[in-house]
Swiss-Prot record:
Applied biotechnology uses: Escherichia coli expressing SsLPS and SsSCS from Salvia sclarea and CrtE from Pantoea agglomerans can produce sclareol in high-cell-density fermentation conditions, thus being an alternative, sustainable, and cost-efficient route to sclareol and other diterpene analogs.
The protein's name in its UniProt record: Sclareol synthase, chloroplastic
Cited function: Involved in the biosynthesis of labdane-type diterpenoid including sclareol, a diterpene-diol that is used as fragrance and flavoring, and has anticancer effects (able to kill leukemic and colon cancer cells by apoptosis). Sclareol can also be used as synthesis precursor of ambergris substitution fragance products such as ambrox. Terpene synthase that catalyzes the conversion of 8-hydroxy-copalyl diphosphate to sclareol.
Ranges that cross the membrane: none
Motif (DDXXD motif): 329-333
Amino acid sequence: MSLAFNVGVTPFSGQRVGSRKEKFPVQGFPVTTPNRSRLIVNCSLTTIDFMAKMKENFKREDDKFPTTTTLRSEDIPSNLCIIDTLQRLGVDQFFQYEINTILDNTFRLWQEKHKVIYGNVTTHAMAFRLLRVKGYEVSSEELAPYGNQEAVSQQTNDLPMIIELYRAANERIYEEERSLEKILAWTTIFLNKQVQDNSIPDKKLHKLVEFYLRNYKGITIRLGARRNLELYDMTYYQALKSTNRFSNLCNEDFLVFAKQDFDIHEAQNQKGLQQLQRWYADCRLDTLNFGRDVVIIANYLASLIIGDHAFDYVRLAFAKTSVLVTIMDDFFDCHGSSQECDKIIELVKEWKENPDAEYGSEELEILFMALYNTVNELAERARVEQGRSVKEFLVKLWVEILSAFKIELDTWSNGTQQSFDEYISSSWLSNGSRLTGLLTMQFVGVKLSDEMLMSEECTDLARHVCMVGRLLNDVCSSEREREENIAGKSYSILLATEKDGRKVSEDEAIAEINEMVEYHWRKVLQIVYKKESILPRRCKDVFLEMAKGTFYAYGINDELTSPQQSKEDMKSFVF
């Protein structure tokens, strides 16, 4: 296959992005220039060309790749590498049938404890991670021999192997998985030392290790794809014994395909930002003189969390809802009076374009009408998607979160004494993840029954994701207050210092809360990775990516209040 590149400078047209089933038109790898033009790279590679070539690499010459395909065991390591590459570059969705077939065969070999899996540390760790994430029952005890560095060093220590052990250990879903805890502990120390000592000669590999160590749980699919496009190097897998299935696939094949896919996503993202800004102005939200301006960061987080470019409307719905939740939170938290907050809740419960009573202020009218019109629009779109009305359900979710905001306001205003456990049991409802996640699920191509939406599984998944967000936000706020020398502590931190009638330091309280974050994160993974489930995996993945987005937003710094890392990342999202 030839790759013919034609380079020219063309203004970004903003035209509709074509289907991935079409031959790629002139797709841009945009490079910022003073006149705001973009460098366009025209490639003759087609989606079908590359996918056909990839699918050929997944099978033997005499295979038709039927459902019952049994692959040669010696092919598994290289096929796992291909799967990992496709996932890292964010294009695995185009090869799910082939990936599932390979993982079925890998699981069979895992159960047999076949030497092709168990005879190589890197293959063993990668197989564990890929199988667990897909919901296969694999015991972490099989990785117990790698629980200390000395044991691994005797098997020829190399950096990619340790990275794979680190990634596998991050898939710990049960408290009792001590072997993964041990692996994560020593690999983290080892990799940190390698970075600090500047001991990694390969610059790309050095940056990859830095990226993983900075905030591993906060790596969404799209964020990971962007970084791996920059740092991609097939020699990363050279330690694996393979049948050279990559021989007729050069790095450019992978990169051109993945960059074209990413470029489609980013073109849609830019269009989505324009639509979001127009909506924000049309709702007159730009005239309000309080609260955080989160339009850009909300659009960016939506693009990180909703990665499939077929879901451009879903990203817009997600971003609009995130903006509204933030504005309402700010209104209840620091601007509106208790009476005004009660009024907003009454208006939402009534849900009329022309309410029976007066608004009382222009701000209340702007807030309610923005919410009213937006929810009605989203509900109508969801009705088409679901084949039934979900407006009442969405309005109830808004009443729920606004009522939770009011309870928190009253608790603070009235000086109500609350224990840490009381706070934890109710505070998750004031986190926007449940509302935003349940709304987003309406648009991902799955018909949702009341049984599914009201199920214990759905409630638990939303609750655990919300708790991750609530607790991370509180810890982040506490750290910011400490750095800025602001009096007072984040509420949960304050309560945690006096938990169970004992007095502990703020640092001890934060450590305990971080342990709680890990607990709820593991619960999220348990529910998402479980195969026997009332919710389809596509729906659960919405909440999984939201949880990752929460780690991204609050894992290091409060990116909604004072964006730092996100600003740098947004710049880097332009090739």
